[in-house]
Amino acid sequence: MSWLSTISLAHRKLAALIFLLVLAFGAAVIPSIKQQVLPDLNLPVVGIVAADPGSSPAVVEQQIVEPLEAAVAGVAGIERTTSTSRQGAATVALFFTYGTDLTDAQAQVVTAVSKAAATLPTGVSPQVFVASTSDLPTLTLSVASSTMDQQELAGRVRSRVAPELERIDGVNEVTVSGERGRVVRVTPDPAKLAAAGLTVDALSAALAPLGRTRPAGTVSDDRSVISVQVGGPLAAPRDLEQLTVAPAAPGGDAGGRAARPVRLADVATVTVTEAPATSLTRTDGRPSLGVALTMGTGGSSAHISEQVHERLPDLRDALGEGAALTVVSDFGPSVRDSVQGLLVKGALGMVMAVLVIVLFLRSLRSTVVAAVSIPLSLVIALIVLWQQGLSLNVLTLGALTIAVGRVVDDSIVVLENIKRHLGYGTARAEAVRTGVREVAGAVTSSTLTTVAVFVPIMAVSGLVGELFTPFSLTVAVAMLASLVVSLTVIPVLAYWFLTPPPVGADPERFRREAEEAERNGWLQRRYVTVLHRSLAHRRRVLVFGVVTLLASVGLAGLLKTTFIGDEGGDTLTVTQRLAPGSGLGVTDAAAQRVEQVLSGLAEVESYQVTIGSAGGFGAAFSGAGVDTASFQVALAPDADPAATRDLLTERLAALTGVGDLTVGTGEAAQSLVQIALTGDDPAALRAATGTVVDALAGLPALRKVTSDLAEAAPQITVTADPARAGRYGLTDAVLAEVVGRAVQGRTVNTLTIGDARYDLVLDPGTDVPTSVDEVRALALTTPAGRVRLDQVATVDLVDAPTSRTRVDGEPTVTVTAEPAGTDTGAAGTAVREALDGVDLPAGVTWSLGGVNADQEEAFRQLGLAMAAAVALVCL
């Protein structure tokens, strides 16, 4: 490799210019490198979601989940399939092997699902999407107003705030949640309908095509052809009242009055109302909207945060008087603090390295020449990060910090050898060439050996590879850059800046004096003494080394282990789950009690609560219904997140009748231990779940143990009597349609009225039932006349599971435990020991998953990478 120095010395100015250009280019591109806490994680997961309002979990599983699972079974690369069936919704998650082309996988899944669409219930349209951590909001805002209603506020947010936020570099999408839309509700009068000879079905048929534009041919002449279309949007909701729902009867009526068309206003009332609430959002106790920003490819959480905070005053002004715009959660500050903290530590490491160089080289010129390799090598590594689209995060910055102490080694070796030959009286050019030639092989082999330690990590697959490949790449590039710098830039700088021997000096005298000075140096004298003693007691030294190695290996087992530690942050989360089947009002009342606790804590700067699912990434898989409330808690700048979490947990534990409360951090998913229980017998699975929860509940290593075993919720079942229902022309499908219309009405159209879109809802025309007895008493209109529901069907109130979960087609329950501390490895060991002595019902098996499975797989792969690194070093 000494040929590099020969070329550099022959073209010194060109070499210096090239590396100055490298520094300038680095200064231009490094600020654009995105900043994150952790690297982007491209999870190999394709999700399928489907909605079928009103269907029970059992029906969803049978009619939607099972056909979808069968349809995608032939897609290549699927490792595991999980599905959850809930009231009116199905979710299927397909886990592929890491390295799978998700674009191709998604296309295959879409094709498979489209083929199965014909077997699904009418109106069910599955949606396929690729899961990604970039779809998680990087920043969330809350918007409230004391002067505007929700619709007006939402309109201003969508027209004035969202477009401005979408212009921020790195923002992928801005979503607004919490808005209750408006519906046009048509409520028929049964008596007037009967007098006009109409039915609800006839009314529905008249409303269904309303507002559509239809082609009516063309008008042409010799010069042009003009198309004709009929229909268009309504100007106002009241225009509906003039809709003709039945033409005039020919010849007039029996009373001699002139016949006239039947207008909608003659048989029904038309009102504009808010859509039924399926979720509520409040910020600091006030009704609000949520605005979530997701980060696109190449985006930076820190940059997005800075830009949003800069725009907040203008955005508040754009919303108008009385509007409040608040940042609820923001990953930017924690990312910025993590990055800046590592930058400071890296800078301190660089300073310490320079001081050590001064101590040993005892020359300011030599120190400056050697120290040049540090920023130059790191800049080259950062340029590669930028070129690869990687980010500055705790792992890549940690890699740069590690590299600081190593990148200068090659330069010191080369520089010290050049300086030694200059001390021998050798001419400057010859001293540089000889000094580099003597150590080039050693420096190259040493650096390549060190790089070889990190290369196997780049071959690791899975989540570990996603996390540590940027780390190993950064270290490897920095060290290779240091090798190139030591063999090119350092010789040139040494030629220019190191003091040459005096002209006419006696080389032999200089060599003798230099060698004598080396022998009498304090470091060499002490080292030679230690070396002699070690060689005189070779066996003792070897035994000491072996004992030290074995002791180190033994002590490693005493270390705490965790997968991805908690980065802290300035946000907490609170999840509140009430009994299944709890209504929105019950959950709202319980959430208000939690809000009272939050508002009384000085450590809490702001909070937002969402009851039900407000949409966004993960909503499909969260299972959040109106019996669940989720809180985002922004802490005050001087608050201690860990202490505040403990205090909040203590305060909430004192509440009664508010459901199950869980306090967590606002960072990525917590380190939870999960136990998967699998079995075909629901009763055995339920019994096994109780046994496992009881076995783990008392373990000191665990803080909280829960399960996703679906609790029972009230459900009304209607079972048709084939004989009696058949006399009235009622099949199961017809009965479901008639009962559904009587219970909740139906959306028959979506209209554009003015600039807004409204769902057109046809009410049943009677009071909506609120109890099982009222459902039994429903009067159904059939072709054979009116009949009570309980005369043609059996109506029962039963308890039914609120959800059904399957893994690879088998019913599964997951027991989740939160470690009491940071040692997730110890928590997993305690769980294994506890469950090894538990007898589960026949047919039920358990397996450890969650963070422990991830951690074990990570340690296994990194262990193999370490073994491969040792093998490469020994080659």
Model-derived regions: residue spans:
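C-terminal transmembrane helical bundles of large multi-pass transporters
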Residues: 331, 657-875
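Membrane-water interface of transmembrane alpha-helices in multipass transporters/channels
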Residues: 36-42, 363-373, 386-403, 459-477, ...
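Helix-loop junctions and hydrophobic alpha-helical segments within the transmembrane domains
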Residues: 328, 335, 339, 415, ...
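Signature of alpha-helical transmembrane segments and their immediate interfacial
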Residues: 1-35, 439, 510-564
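Hydrophobic transmembrane alpha-helices and their membrane-interface caps
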Residues: 29, 323-324, 352-359, 364-419, ...
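Hydrophobic, glycine/alanine-rich multi-pass transmembrane helices and their short helix-loop junctions
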Residues: 27, 355-360, 380-392, 444-490, ...
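Juxtamembrane segments of multi-pass membrane proteins
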Residues: 525-528, 536-654, 659-660, 671-674
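Membrane-proximal extracytoplasmic
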Residues: 1-347, 392, 466, 801-816
